[in-house]
Structures are given as C-alpha cells and as structure tokens.
Amino acid sequence: MSTTTQNIPWYRHLNRAQWRAFSAAWLGYLLDGFDFVLIALVLTEVQGEFGLTTVQAASLISAAFISRWFGGLMLGAMGDRYGRRLAMVTSIVLFSAGTLACGFAPGYITMFIARLVIGMGMAGEYGSSATYVIESWPKHLRNKASGFLISGFSVGAVVAAQVYSLVVPVWGWRALFFIGILPIIFALWLRKNIPEAEDWKEKHAGKAPVRTMVDILYRGEHRIANIVMTLAAATALWFCFAGNLQNAAIVAVLGLLCTAIFISFMVQSTGKRWPTGVMLMVVVLFAFLYSWPIQALLPTYLKTDLAYNPHTVANVLFFSGFGAAVGCCVGGFLGDWLGTRKAYVCSLLASQLLIIPVFAIGGANVWVLGLLLFFQQMLGQGIAGILPKLIGGYFDTDQRAAGLGFTYNVGALGGALAPIIGALIAQRLDLGTALASLSFSLTFVVILLIGLDMPSRVQRWLRPEALRTHDAIDGKPFSGAVPFGSAKNDLVKTKS
C-alpha cells in the first residue's frame, strides 16, 4: 500500500456492498452460535429428562461435530461450484431445521440425529461464510474480515445464555430450541440481497464450472470406493460417539479407520499438496481439543461444581462469550499488524497465564471469575477468529470453500472428543481441574504447530515440488516454506 492509502482509516477502504456482505454473513454466524450452544446450556435438564449418563449427555454435544466433516465437504463444494451465497443460505436452513427438531425430540437417539443435522449446517456456514467475507474484503484487511466475522458466533452464544435464563425456568428446555428457528426468516431475506464474493466472481467469469472436491471424490474413477469409505466413516463415528461402545480398543481401531479415510480423501482431492492439508487438519484438531472442553462443559461446571443458579450461570457465560467476541475482533487487528501466525502464537501464550486461575479461585466471587474468563477467552478462544484466514491461505480460490470446510471440520472432530475426554477425566478428578489441565497442556501443542508453520514445513519435507511459498489470500510469505539457513541468506542478500 502507498503512504496515502495507509493514512486512510481501515474502515474507509470498504464500500457499502462489502459492509452489507459482511453484515449478512455475521448475522448467519450469530444464528449459528445461538443454535449450536443451546444444547450446552440445557445439558443437565436434557440429561435428567432422558435419564442419560454424563458421557451420553456429552455425546449430544459431540454429535454436531461428527457430521461436520461431510457438511463442510458437500456445502463447501456447493460454494466452489455455484457461489458462496447459495451455500450460506443452504447452511443456515439446515442448522435451523436441526434446532427445531431438537425441541420435538422424544429421546436420546432422535436428539442425536437432530444434532447431526445441525453439525452439517454449521460446517457449511463456517466454510461458505468465511470464504465469502474474506474474498469480498481487500487483501490487507482479511484478518479483520475473518476475526470480525467469527465474533458473531460468540455473540450468538452470549444471546443464547441470556435467553436461557429467561425462558428455561418458565417454559422448560424445549422452548429454547423453538426460539432458535425464529431469526431464519430475516437471515434468508438478507442473504437474497447480497452480492457474490469478488474473488469467486473474478475466478469464474466466463469460465466452465470448476471441478470440486465432490466431483473428484464422488464422480471420479474411485467414486464407488469413496462412497463405501464415506459410509464406513459415518458408521464408525456413530459407534464411537453415540455412547454405546465401552471397549477402548474398539474405539481406537474405529478412530484409526476414520483417520485413514480422511487422509485418503485429502490425498485424492489435493494431489501433491496433501501434506499441507493433513497438517492443517492436525492443527484444527488440537485447536478444538484445547478450547472445546471449556466451551462445551463450562455451563455444567458452573451449575454442578459451583452450584450457580440459571441467572448466575447466564451472567458468567456473558463474560465468557463477550470475551471471545472481543478477542475475535482484537485478533483481526493483531493479524493484520503482526501477521496471522505471529498474532496467533502471542495471543495463546498470553492466555496460558489465566487458564489455571480461572478454575482455581472457585465460585465465591462471581465478578472475579467473570473477569478472568473474559480475558482468558479473549486471548485463548478469540484468536481463533483468524483461523479461517490462516487455513484459507493454503488453498486456491477454486477449492477454498471445500478445502477450508473439509479441513476445518475434520479437525473439528477434536470438538467431539473434547467434552467426552473432559467428562471421563472428571470421573477421577473434579471437573474444573480436568478442564484446566486439558486446555493448558494442549494449547502448547497448537502454539508449536502454528508458530513453526508445520503445514508448510511438512509439505517441504515430503513433497517440495508442490510447495506454496506465499499465502494465497494476502500474498505474505510462509515461514515454514524456507529452511532457516536459506531464510537468513535471503535476508542478507536483500540488505546488501
């Protein structure tokens, strides 16, 4: 950018159409967050009515993650072929319909299936909305676009917590799911009046339809085998997370089977760049493993371990959700200033100072707990607002929605594991200690994976001929694409 351009406030670089596009996508994310966290808020009520164990109840949270990989793949491919806008509308209809079905669920299995539908819609919303907004905004503002957008999910969670405190004590938990369907009408109207993403329009102007990941996997020469593997993965995940299997060895075998299937899909769809795709799935997996024990089980911790009433729970969750929302926006500014990966690492390191105190102080002082949660979530959870931008930079426009959707939502199975792992550890320790231990230890893994740019590094080690050296979204260099010695030599040459 020129000096004159840099002196203009960032928001003046955006026109009315770009703001309208962002507003529509942000509203979709708010609804997504509202619908998704409802189950966490009423988990104890559902558990009591259906007579579930703690692990079975936690699996209702996990259910939405089980179907996300397929929803991200299918709806992402729809976005790559037909445009980001159609994929967004389809996604929001899916997760809203699933939310309504939860309100009518007569038992555990029915609610589990409804949560699968929510997961598919949520996955499509993530991939299509993120690519839509990122591709609509100027390149130098795309961390802000990503962070601001993802803040909508946290705002939706805050709104859900406040509605929970007003609705559930009077009308019961089912009424909360009925409310989750109402905003869909306005969202659909808004989505019909927004422009298509600029990057997508430019890429597809006057050209034949692109060959999407769905075309490669389900219309190519290996389509029969891939359909069989898809059914096998769905069945394996069902048995792993529906709370029916007690044998850890069988669960481990099924988990390895799913891992092999997902890697096979990544190899087929990305070709020589499969090491990058696989490592991105690993990054997202650990990102969910460190963050989602708290996201999913914090309401349960507040109600059981701290014995808070619904009103107090809602107040504490307000601090938590609002902190995450603020953190998404702060992360956007940090990402555009420091660079995506450096901002991510710095924010996570700062969050580590707060995670132990959050669960060590107990529940005597609600305000202190709320403030600690606000800052911990701002730094630890909020920085995930720029994760779509980080992942999307490794994919070309033609496969960005499906690549982001599939990669992110396969890794998001960590979110399915997280509450169950937390619940299992809580059978031996108290829940607060379990949540703090998981989050503290696994955050360091994410710091290393992102800080060392392991997707580029592993690509360079295994398939260097397909190495991408610069971010496809903002054009900035990937640190892991260049050996340390070469990077130092290049710097010397540049200065001389």
From Swiss-Prot:
One of its GO terms (cellular component) is plasma membrane. PROSITE patterns: MFS. InterPro entries: MFS, MFS_dom, MFS_trans_sf, SA_transporter. It catalyses: N-acetylneuraminate(in) + H(+)(in) = N-acetylneuraminate(out) + H(+)(out). It comes from the Bacteria. The keyword Membrane applies. The keyword Transport applies. It holds the Pfam family MFS_1. PANTHER family: CARBOXYLIC ACID TRANSPORTER PROTEIN HOMOLOG, SIALIC ACID TRANSPORTER NANT. This is Sialic acid transporter NanT. The gene is nanT.
